[in-house]
């Protein structure tokens, strides 16, 4: 199970709103204690695609985030991105691009501006989705 603080959620939400009308993205790093994963830091990255339907994280920012995780004793827990105009569930492209069955994929839907929805998913090797 993944645990995220309210302040980290608000940081992600602000980043995703600032990215509108495009998708926004980032990484999450933290610690694992048994079955529990605790997000300790949210890394706000640039969507190189500047698109409202897909994203590509800036590779330099990704590398800097991973270096920071290592420096702080964190492990990569997964990534997040927004869906400006669709629900909080993996699209076919999201499933196709899911590279790690152990990574958490967080999707923040901004489809209803007054009611953002954040969900976490796992995507296995067969591209089957499990909601966390």
Q: Where are the regions a protein language model picked out?
A:
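Conserved beta-strand-loop surface patch within small alpha/beta domains used
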Residues: 1-76, 85-132
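Short, well-ordered beta-to-alpha junction loops that form the rim of enzyme active sites
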Residues: 82
